[in-house]
UniProtKB/Swiss-Prot annotation:
Keywords: Cytoplasm, Nucleus, Protein transport, Transport. Involved in nuclear export, actin cytoskeleton organization and vesicular transport. It comes from Candida glabrata (strain ATCC 2001 / BCRC 20586 / JCM 3761 / NBRC 0622 / NRRL Y-65 / CBS 138) (Yeast). GO terms for biological process: protein transport. One of its GO terms (cellular component) is cytoplasm. The keyword Cell inner membrane does not apply. This is Protein BCP1. It is found in: Cytoplasm; Nucleus. It comes from the Eukaryota.
Length: 276
């Protein structure tokens, strides 16, 4: 059953998607204002209101949009190492939350999915993760050997202009759904794949000679920023986190975090966003 929630409800629970309420106006306004003029207070400001609804992942509607967002998350090179269609199917068969603005039949602007590692450890994506880095391989192998700890493979991506206010309810909803699917128990650990970017990356220079690329790497080594601001907080409390090599300005990011630390990170992120 497709469900939705208003952003104003802060995402603690999903509400039933009653057809008679599909056109109901959301109570939250995510607004942007033009305040460039010094005397903007004396002028009429333009306000753009956007209503965001949270839905369960829908294989019949969301497949192609989720596949596109996965490709955006992994980047052009890593995407070629993963079976994207199979991964999209896996995501949409797992506890997944999407965010839309034009009703349940529209394309999602954002998704967050918790893939049960134990149930899908033989999937193409799990095999891909084990080959990425010995730290991930060792962690997953430990889970396989002990057998008494659960783990979610977390995938999340969104359009670049999505407001950060959606992140906290997005995670809380999906954690609640994942626990409900596991007899009320949350996952013990989460393996999060994300991405960063080189702030000063120059595509023209990247296409030049090798020495130019090498010099650029040295100059821009510390000039790295986050696509997902919440990753700063995840890394702060992570058991393990590391970055991959820069590929045309894109840097893969990997985080292993336990449940309590994930909850703490989300709470801290919510508090930080409230001050922006």
């Amino acid at each position: 059953m497709v469900q939705a929630i208003k952003l104003s409800e802060l995402g603690n629970r999903k509400r039933r998607n009653d057809p008679v309420n599909e056109d109901e106006e959301s109570e939250i306004d995510i607004s942007s204002t033009d305040s460039e003029e010094e005397n903007a207070g004396d002028e009429e400001q333009e306000i753009v209101n956007i209503d965001f609804d949270f839905f369960d992942g829908n294989p019949d509607v969301d497949f192609h949009a989720v596949k596109h967002l996965i490709r955006q998350l992994l980047g052009p090179q890593e995407s070629n190492r993963v079976q994207l269609s199979a991964l999209s199917d896996l995501i949409l068969s797992s506890p997944t939350t999407t965010i839309k603005t034009d009703g349940k039949e529209s394309d999602p602007y954002c998704f967050l999915s918790f893939i049960n590692y134990k149930e899908n450890k033989d999937s193409d994506y799990a095999k891909y993760l084990r080959k990425l880095d010995t730290r991930i391989e060792t962690f997953l192998q430990t889970l396989d050997n002990t057998g008494n700890k659960s783990c979610a493979l977390v995938m999340s991506e969104r359009l670049i202009n999505m407001p950060p206010e959606v992140v906290t309810p997005l995670y809380r909803i999906t954690m609640e759904d994942a626990a409900a699917a596991n007899e009320g128990k949350p996952f013990d650990f989460y393996v999060i794949v994300s991405r960063k970017y080189e702030v000063n990356f120059d595509m023209d220079e990247a296409e030049g000679d090798a020495s130019a690329r090498s010099k650029k790497r040295v100059r821009g080594k510390s000039e790295v920023d986050y696509f997902h601001e919440e990753d700063r907080f995840f890394e702060k409390h992570a058991k393990v986190h590391f970055d991959g090599e820069s590929k045309k300005g894109l840097i893969a990011s990997y985080i292993i975090i336990d449940h309590d630390s994930l909850v703490k990170s989300i709470n801290e992120f919510e508090q930080e966003v409230s001050t922006w």
